[in-house]
Amino acid sequence: TVAGKPVLRKHLTIVLTSDHGGSGTGHADATVREHYRVPFLTWGDGVDAEDLYALNPTYKKPRRKRPGYGAARQPVRNGDVANLALSLLGLRAIPGSTIGTDQDLVLTADAGG
């Protein structure tokens, strides 16, 4: 396992998420949490064992709501994954992307990513 290999563990960050669920024949009902609530987990050397929203106060924890894309403060979204991964690799955001382009999602209280 990764945990048993110190050299690998020191250079690896895992970012895990999934697609949202659905029920019946759709998945757009904003009143059904399973239509929009998904896991977004990170693990690795330098990743704090902390809630992403505690580390990223500029993001809005949605709680039981589903904020629209036009809201002033956004929740962490699946769309943040690609630009977070690129940031971890020291690369710029995907050209033309609209989510996470500032690459300001941090995984540590040091804000060093």
Language-model segments: what does each one mean?
Residues 1-11, 20-113:
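Membrane-interface soluble catalytic domains
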Residues 15-17:
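Generic enzyme active-site microenvironment
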